Amino acid sequence: MADFNKVGVLILRGDRLLLCRKNRDTSKLILPGGRTEAGETDLDCLARELREELGEVTLRNVEYVGTYEDRAAFDDPTIVKTLRVALYRGNLVGTPTPASEITEVVWFGPDSDVAELTPIFINRILPDLLSRGILPWSARRAPGPRWGER
């Protein structure tokens, strides 16, 4: 059973993936999204979290991608927790700008450094998205250093 359950969203612009950096817990890049509140559906959660994290944006054409589980990312190596992410993908309407606890918005691509990513993204999400052709990167062009060897 996971210690944390979150909902995340995959937003692409060309071959770039929208990721965020928070101001607490980890310096790694994360998917936009968060924890559902009582009575919220996953899609309600995504709408709320996107407004809180990225300002006046909305999500269109949302579809479920999959659920992934791995260790959560913390800068403190003594903290060991498990994270489960229900991942969706959709089209963003509006310009994302850092808000609330988000300090940076990054368009991550095949030329970006995989060391910036969280364990769940490296170990579970990225390999699945590449194998299913959801990310428009070939394994040859996947983020370095060689993501498959991590």
Label each PLM-derived region with a short phrase.
Residues 1-17, 35:
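Conserved N-terminal beta-strand and adjoining loop/helix that marks the start
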Residues 11-12, 19, 90, 107:
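Conserved hydrophobic "DFG−1" position in protein kinase catalytic cores
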Residues 16-56:
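Conserved Nudix-box catalytic region and its N-terminal flanking loop in Nudix hydrolases
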Residues 57-67:
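A short coil-to-beta-strand element that immediately follows conserved catalytic motifs
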Residues 69-96, 128:
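Active-site-adjacent beta-strand/loop module that shapes the phosphate/pyrophosphate-binding cleft
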Residues 87-89, 97-130:
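NUDIX/MutT-family hydrolases
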Residues 117-150:
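Charged phosphate-binding loop/patch that engages nucleotide di/tri-phosphates or the phosphate backbone
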